[in-house]
Amino acid sequence: MLAEYRGKKTIEMLWRGIWAYVKHHRIDAMIGCASIEGTDVSLIANQLSFLYHFSQAAPEWQTSPLARRHTEMNRVSKGDVDVKKALASLPPLIKGYMRVGAKFGNGAVVDRQFGVTDVFVVMPISEIETRYIEYFDEDAAAIVKAA
């Protein structure tokens, strides 16, 4: 998306459209990946460890990359994770996913071609906080009818 269109209203419109799709097709969970800038995992160890220790998906949603692509996320012990620094340095998209209720897989993939490290994201619909459902649902019906 072009930088000039990355504002709050555009993101909200995208989320309302996603929510309309989820409702229309009765989807149980949304999955995908999110990227952390950088391929030197020693520089993003605190962020990866934070996701591993504090925001890991439940066992029934757990997944990890293929062994040949797997990068360990548990790089710093839970007690040594600088939570404040991790939260401040995580990409806005990952923080947004976390606010809504998303969780993360076990293991990351370094993508040198794009200069990022990717993590698996799962958002079971049943775990989305009610306030977000109410917020994004106000226009969802209109979007579904227009489609």
Whereabouts are the PLM-identified features?
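Short, cationic low-complexity segments
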Residues: D139-A147
